């Protein structure tokens, strides 16, 4: 029985890895072994950062809401507590968008939160 080296399968597998490494710099793009390692590491970073992105955006929204609330003479935590007591159910993403785009509407929400805290 003749020896089978698996040339086409091996080449296809390596070509796939090199294709995934497109855009990397130097040896990480051209050499199979380092490209494979970098593609694996990139996958780990992507997995981690898909979860991290959610945390980062929540932090950003809270920072924006806090800044806008302090412009209206109230802290973030008091604002959120006041909104909860006033039965205003609005998520942080929408609240931060309102704070950026419509200061008047955000001011009204702050006033309702202040009234609910009294």
UniProtKB/Swiss-Prot annotation:
The GO annotation for biological process reads:
ribosomal large subunit assembly; translation
Which InterPro entries would you find in this protein's record?
Ribosomal_bL20 (IPR005813), RIBOSOMAL_L20_CS (IPR049946), Ribosomal_protein_bL20_C (IPR035566)
Keyword list, A-Z: Ribonucleoprotein, Ribosomal protein, RNA-binding, rRNA-binding
Write down the Pfam families for this protein, in alphabetical order.
Answer: Ribosomal_L20
Similarity-based family:
Belongs to the bacterial ribosomal protein bL20 family.
Q: What is the documented function of this protein?
A: Binds directly to 23S ribosomal RNA and is necessary for the in vitro assembly process of the 50S ribosomal subunit. It is not involved in the protein synthesizing functions of that subunit.
Q: Can you name this protein?
A: Large ribosomal subunit protein bL20
Give the originating organism: Staphylococcus carnosus (strain TM300)
The root-end lineage is: Bacteria, Bacillati, Bacillota, Bacilli, Bacillales
């Amino acid at each position: 029985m003749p020896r089978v080296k698996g040339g086409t399968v091996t080449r296809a597998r390596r070509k796939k890895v090199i294709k995934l490494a497109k855009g990397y710099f130097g040896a990480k793009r051209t050499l199979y072994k380092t490209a494979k390692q970098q593609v694996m590491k990139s996958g780990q970073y992507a997995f981690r950062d898909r979860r991290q992105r959610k945390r980062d955006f929540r932090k950003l929204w809270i920072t924006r809401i806090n800044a806008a609330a302090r412009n209206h003479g109230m802290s973030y935590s008091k604002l959120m507590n006041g909104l909860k007591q006033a039965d205003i159910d609005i998520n942080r993403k929408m609240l931060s968008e309102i704070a950026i785009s419509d200061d008047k509407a955000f001011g009204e929400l702050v006033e309702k939160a202040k009234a609910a805290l009294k």
